[in-house]
Amino acid sequence: MSTSKTIVFGLFVATLLVSCNVAANATTQPLFPAILIFGDSTVDTGNNNYHSQTIFKAKHLPYGVDLPGHEANGRYSNGKVISDVIASKLNIKELVPPFLQPNISHQDIVTGVSFASAGAGYDDRSSLSSKAIPVSQQPSMFKNYIARLKGIVGDKKAMEIINNALVVISAGPNDFILNFYDIPTRRLEYPTIHGYQEFILKRLDGFVRELYSLGCRNIVVGGLPPMGCLPIQMTAKMRNILRFCVEQENKDSVLYNQKLVKKLPEIQASLPGSNFLYANVYDPLMDMIQNPSKYGFKETKKGCCGTGYLETTFMCNPLTKTCPNHSDHLFWDSIHPSEAAYNYIGNFVDAQIRGWIKA
């Protein structure tokens, strides 16, 4: 090969390598600088492990059995929870650490954490028995986080990260299950589901406004799942050996979600520079329930842990048997989805977020 041809070939290879490198960087570039998580057990990645007052902890097997190292670290699933899945799909990080975790790294502070607490809800009453950290108290942790972030990157950069971070909120089922359906203490004050839904939406409104005042701008709010299809609710309302979804509770979920869809644009219009997205988790879950074979599920009416009818938190423990194939169950315990289900839900929410960014 002549010298001139060698030079041309070398330039071609160099250009190709640079192009491939740019393309790779483009695909792995995080869509947000950080992810900040608030809510309940669906997004609690271990805060309750370090919250001594609560009885709701998932720091024992079989929780976490399919995580690297087979380590139970506070996630209410056999593996990742939805907050991890979303963070991974958006190229932010593989696992979202809990804020209360001791010795959390500077890098994890900078790229985001979870403030969620299993057992929490928008209604503080939801945490009375479990002593979980209510959603209303999670901004206190967030304020401590902001102070730590400023100490790492400085005031200006910290606020830039928070302004551009993706905020994900997942809460609500505990409020209705613990206060209205199974333990109807709130029915004395709110006789109809409509009244209690309005109360919860008002609490949500105040919560997101507080986050906005602290610098959050990109806020994703999860709707309710089909609550009547949670195994524990099917058990609570079971009248014979056959198990069916509780249709009224599903209808209530749909009604609440419709109200939330209407509410979020109203909040956004009143908060300059804010961007709100309703995350639809109802439809993907219902599709999995109605068309299980499409997703590789063989069981959708009970969890993988124990009988699958009641077991959750301390009732799902190292002495409890689990199903042989974890990925063919929609639910891991009587309330929480399996990692396989969270992955499918995550795909759906990821598509929503990407469409939202482009809009």
UniProtKB/Swiss-Prot annotation:
It is found in: Secreted. The keyword Cytoplasm does not apply. Pfam families: Lipase_GDSL (PF00657). GO terms for cellular component: extracellular region. Keywords: Glycoprotein, Hydrolase, Lipid degradation, Lipid metabolism, Secreted, Signal. Its main location: secreted. Glycans are attached at residues 103, 325. Residues 1-28 form the signal peptide. The active site is at 41 (nucleophile), 333, 336. CDD domains: SGNH_plant_lipase_like. Its EC number is 3.1.1.-. GO terms for biological process: lipid catabolic process. GO terms for molecular function: hydrolase activity, acting on ester bonds. It comes from the Eukaryota. PANTHER family: GDSL ESTERASE/LIPASE EXL3 (PTHR45642), GENOME ASSEMBLY, CHROMOSOME: A04 (PTHR45642:SF148). Belongs to the 'GDSL' lipolytic enzyme family. This is GDSL esterase/lipase At2g30310. It comes from Arabidopsis thaliana (Mouse-ear cress).
